[in-house]
Design a protein with these regions (language model features):
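N-terminal nucleotide-binding beta1-loop-alpha1 segment
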Residues: 1-17
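Conserved N-terminal catalytic core of the sugar/cofactor nucleotidyltransferase
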Residues: 31-95
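Short, well-formed alpha-helical segments that are part of the catalytic scaffolds
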Residues: 16-39
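Conserved core of the sugar-phosphate nucleotidyltransferase
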Residues: 79, 85-86, 98, 106-136
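Hydrophobic/aromatic residues located in beta-strands of well-ordered beta-sheets
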Residues: 5, 46-48, 129
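Short beta-strand/turn micro-motifs composed of small residues
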Residues: 9, 50, 131-133
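Catalytic metal- and UDP-sugar-binding loop of GT-A-like glycosyltransferases, i.e.
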Residues: 102
């Protein structure tokens, strides 16, 4: 079974410009997410789905072969695109059996948690999606 982590990076963030690529400690949110996902043995591939030239440049320079990019069409990076449309589009353009949606804005999800979620999901056919939540 091919399991792909999809990291969405939108260059036109409305509230914080390039938030996923801004300095965060000694790295940035995208690279932190990639480093965490590279530790998840269940993943067969990691794809950064983006319309950001800078994100593509960083991935191509720093993660040759280990991480790929998919250049997102501008419509799917716009505020006109609904969440449902975006997820349908991800399913259509991601060559995989199962995709794991991994936004950079959740930087503290541990690799072990991602592994547990994948294993929980593939161990049953009762569900078609799974989400992580925290009690507050």
């Amino acid at each position: 079974m091919k399991i792909t982590a999809v990291i969405p990076i939108r260059s036109g963030s409305q509230r914080v410009k390039d938030k996923n690529l801004r300095a965060f400690a000694d790295t940035n949110l995208m690279e932190l997410k990639i480093k965490n996902l590279l530790q998840v043995p269940e993943l067969t591939s990691i794809v950064v789905n983006t319309n950001s030239e800078l994100a593509i440049e960083i991935v191509n320079k720093s993660y040759r072969g280990g991480v790929t990019t998919h250049r997102r069409e501008e419509y799917y990076a716009s505020s006109q695109c609904s969440g449902s449309e975006f997820f349908r589009h991800l399913g259509e353009v991601t060559d995989t059996d199962l995709f794991v949606y991994c936004p950079c804005t959740s930087p503290f999800i541990k690799p072990e948690t991602v592994s547990q979620c994948i294993n929980q999901f593939i161990s049953t056919s009762d569900y078609d999606c799974l989400a992580t939540v925290s009690s507050v």
